[in-house]
């Protein structure tokens, strides 16, 4: 069966820049400060200023570098930058020129960036000063001329976009290029404006093509649900203020900081890089009202001994990118003084396809109600719908789903059913009127025919006072080919002392027999994660498989 949202909306007939800068559906005024530097909020830009800078940068990208000259959706510009005030304007300027915004994580090496440059066919690179050398090295490997490597600096009241340390400052340009207004549904659905790379949790990253329709419907429908559900609740009519701390090379940061705040009518205070102590302080300094982040940040808040009243102005907290365990959710809600709702999605669905309406909450692991116009199914291995209460792979269809992977028809064909449903690879179950996420299909541990969720074991181990962080994967069983043994990779909390035997006993005393750590406990310094906070289990699985399985009779 299909699971439907509470209501549908008419598909928006407008392009992204029109939504951000001209449509009354966005709640910003001309004087609204859209983006400000957290360390110095006098360094900021208003909506009116952002529109002007967008048009000027669009002219620069078109006239100086030919972006969009042969039509929209063909020429990519790659950004490799820490968060900064004018990065959203660069994003909009690229789209305004008819180009495609793409981005590489600042954590990548020059060699990794060069692979992404080639795969995306990027023609220009925009880097922050700290990544200038990396961008040049990557460009050289790809044969991109050095004059097509631009450096953007917009923190500390510096406003520069130039070729390295010299040459013309393109931010001083005055000529403008207005963007093309698009109302045709076909063009909105099929014009790629954003090329973001999947997190690579289960394999090499792939370029996910996102259109005007994808980004506009995602941002707009989420806000419309919230607006509809807060009618009659005047205490919820608070200004939108948040701290920009997520990487913008990923959908959570790109959508959540470039687009959503402008539609919601508020301000992003930008941190160039995440630091938990500074983040907590900024949340108080700017009386933050909205927080959307990943479980590692909530984990940092819970572990901090500095939290007092820094989150007293918070009215809405959301978690995404990875499942939030019940234990961590309850601890974080107590610290924040605010309920946390889980949202669920992925790059291929333009971020989250669920959101929690005002006045509702959940602490059962539910992923929040489906967004308007989306459709969801739960299926078995043969793509047959499962019965209510049975686990199944989640399939999606709707305006937020990508058309596919850039220049990768094989991966695109594999990701979709023949009738157009996107196969998420996530396992869920419909229970008590809610969809509950169980785990990634490829990450479930198979122990003697039973499926074990790493997330459940991780959430429990994080309640141990000596555990700072943990990831669980399946290790090979040397005595039973094809069988997997749960193994925990553990980061010990500073100043604590904990043994493998102690953690095994902790799990044994509280979890079912098939969830025991028969694969052992390995202590490491850091859990490998993507820039968006997802555990890179494939790295740990490779480590586990390269070593002999260690079975303990429990």
UniProtKB/Swiss-Prot annotation:
The residues the record assigns to binding AMP are 195-206
- Report keywords, A-Z: Ligase
PROSITE patterns found in the cross-reference section: AMP_BINDING
Q: Which GO terms describe its molecular function?
A: CoA-ligase activity
Q: Which SUPFAM superfamilies match?
A: Acetyl-CoA synthetase-like (SSF56801)
Which EC number applies? Answer: 6.2.1.-
Q: Which domain of life is it from?
A: Eukaryota
Q: Give the family per the record.
A: Belongs to the ATP-dependent AMP-binding enzyme family.
| The protein's name | Putative acyl-coenzyme A synthetase
């Amino acid at each position: 069966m299909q699971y439907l949202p509470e209501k549908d909306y008419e598909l928006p007939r407008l392009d992204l820049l029109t939504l951000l800068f001209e449509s009354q559906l966005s709640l910003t005024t001309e004087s609204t400060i859209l983006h400000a530097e957290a360390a110095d909020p006098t360094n900021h830009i208003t909506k009116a200023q952002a529109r002007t800078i967008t048009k000027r940068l669009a002219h620069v990208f078109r006239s100086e570098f030919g972006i969009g000259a042969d039509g929209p959706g063909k020429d990519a510009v790659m950004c490799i930058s820490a968060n900064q005030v004018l990065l959203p304007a660069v994003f909009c300027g690229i789209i305004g020129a008819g180009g495609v915004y793409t981005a590489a994580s600042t954590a990548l090496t020059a060699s990794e960036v060069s692979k992404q440059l080639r795969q995306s066919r990027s023609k220009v690179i925009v880097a922050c000063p700290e990544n200038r050398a990396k961008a040049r090295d990557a460009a050289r490997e790809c044969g991109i001329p050095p004059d097509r490597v631009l450096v953007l600096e917009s923190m500390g009241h510096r406003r520069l976009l130039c070729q390295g340390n010299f040459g013309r400052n393109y931010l001083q340009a005055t000529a403008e290029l207005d963007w093309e207004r698009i109302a045709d549904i076909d063009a909105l659905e099929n014009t790629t404006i954003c090329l973001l790379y999947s997190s690579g949790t289960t394999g090499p990253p792939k370029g996910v093509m996102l259109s005007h329709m994808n980004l506009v419907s995602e941002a707009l429908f989420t806000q419309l649900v919230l607006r509809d559900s807060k009618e009659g609740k005047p205490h919820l009519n608070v200004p939108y203020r948040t701290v920009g701390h997520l990487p913008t090379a990923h959908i959570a940061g790109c959508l959540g900081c470039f687009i959503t705040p402008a539609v919601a009518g508020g301000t992003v205070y930008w941190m160039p890089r995440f630091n938990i102590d500074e983040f907590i302080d900024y949340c108080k300094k700017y009386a933050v009202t909205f927080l959307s982040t990943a479980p590692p940040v909530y984990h940092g808040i819970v572990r901090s001994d500095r939290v007092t009243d820094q989150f007293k102005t918070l009215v809405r907290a959301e978690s995404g990118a990875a499942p939030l365990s019940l234990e961590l959710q309850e601890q974080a809600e107590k610290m924040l003084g605010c309920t946390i709702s889980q949202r669920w999605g992925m790059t291929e669905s333009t971020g989250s396809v669920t959101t929690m309406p005002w006045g509702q909450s959940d602490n059962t692991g539910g992923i929040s109600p489906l967004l308007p116009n989306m459709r969801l199914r739960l299926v078995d291995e043969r793509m047959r719908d499962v019965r209510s209460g049975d686990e199944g792979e989640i399939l999606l269809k709707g305006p937020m789903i990508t058309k596919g992977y850039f220049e990768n028809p094989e991966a695109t064909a594999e990701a979709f059913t023949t009738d157009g449903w996107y196969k998420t690879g996530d396992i869920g179950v419909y229970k008590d009127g809610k969809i509950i996420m169980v785990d990634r299909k490829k990450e479930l541990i198979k122990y003697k025919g039973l499926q074990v969720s790493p997330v459940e074991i991780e959430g429990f181990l994080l309640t141990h006072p000596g555990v700072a962080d943990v990831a669980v994967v399946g290790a090979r069983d040397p005595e039973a080919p094809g069988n997997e043994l749960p193994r925990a990779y553990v980061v010990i909390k500073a100043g604590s002392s904990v043994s493998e035997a102690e953690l095994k006993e902790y799990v044994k005393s509280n979890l079912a027999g098939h969830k025991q750590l028969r694969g052992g406990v390995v202590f490491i310094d850091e859990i490998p994660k993507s820039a968006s906070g997802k555990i890179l289990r494939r790295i740990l699985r490779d480590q586990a498989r390269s070593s002999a399985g260690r079975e303990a009779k429990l």
